[in-house]
Amino acid sequence: MRVVAGELRGRRIEAPPGLDTRPTTDMVREATFNALNSLDLVRDARVADLFAGSGALGIEAISRGAADCTFIERDRTAFRTLRDNVAALGLDDRSKIVPGDAMVLGGSLDVDIVLADPPYDFDRWPDLLAATKASFVA
């Protein structure tokens, strides 16, 4: 998996081992960020990547000009991969990596954009949207 566009374009992002985490595909990330960029929302934005997994969404946001990203991930294996990806890409100064439940921690964040790609069986979208203080949720 690679960063699709921006300053980190083409750089590799590792996926967590196993089948518990399914990273957001390049095609989905490209479509998401094309839509966000068409609204001029990403540049200098404060972003949260909930259910972060590998961190692909938040890393893509930073690559495309977001000021910073707070990543929230509760799975220990995915958290380690996320931490390693952020370090390997030199994004420590623009990233905050928080271990924990996105549903609990996500509502307390002061950000402009919330990016969320939860597990397939996630059924709490209304709760997540109600708890989020961001201007835009994708």
Q: Which residues are covered by each model-predicted region?
A:
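Class I S-adenosyl-L-methionine-dependent methyltransferase catalytic core
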Residues: M1-A138
